[in-house]
Amino acid sequence: IDLEHWHAFDFISHEYEDVIVNLHVFHASVSASQLSGIKKPWSWYAREQLSSLNFPKANQSMLQKLQWPQRIKIAEDLATLQQLDPDQMLYWRVAITPERVMQLQQLPIELLSKLIINQELWSQLNELQQQTIRTLHLKQSQLVALQAGQLLRGYRYIAACHDLATLQQAEQIGCEAALLSPVLATPTHPGTETLGWEQFQQLATQVQIPVFALGGLKTEDLSYAQGRHAYGIAGISNI
């Protein structure tokens, strides 16, 4: 098939006992008409189905990047990391200061893989921390300033979006997921115009990356959100 929208996603080098395997991983957008032209032996699987398939060891890091949790907790307290459920990650939404960098340096390395931080904060970390924190957040202002090919290969990006233009921008430059908000009213942003579920669904169905619903949600809303084309939900409280 003739792919028009694609980008390099990762490069993986894995050493077996008798051979070194180099994998070049790409993301591509495939239209419905193109999908109908893809026949056996090719098969398509949802992300959540991949863990049940038998892949070689070389593919494991790629599979980990493709697997997103269904709930993203947003907090300023790093202690929240130790309270996460298996299907959660923490987006540490804080002002970028030297004190915040020092806080990260005091965390056990094994906890960092569950953490999402803004790209600007990530850029101030040491090499080991940068290699461990593989999920980076983009504010909308950062998102619109970037072009395809400028994201770091081997890292996955999740972008803050509020409309179709920014969702499409996130997809086009190679973001792996998006936070679309505000879906419902929130105490932290009273009076802000909300999308509502109907508009959220209309927007989310127009891109091929996972879209997380953000704004006024709680854990009990997950199933309903997924019925509205959300991959998962995110929020400050009750998530």
Where are these regions (language model features)?
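Glycine-rich adenosine-cofactor-binding loop
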Residues: D77, C161, T194-Q199, L203, ...
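A general structural signal for well-ordered alpha-helical segments in protein cores
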Residues: N59-Q60, L167, F200
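Active-site-adjacent beta-strand/loop module that shapes the phosphate/pyrophosphate-binding cleft
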Residues: L3-W6, F11-S36, S43
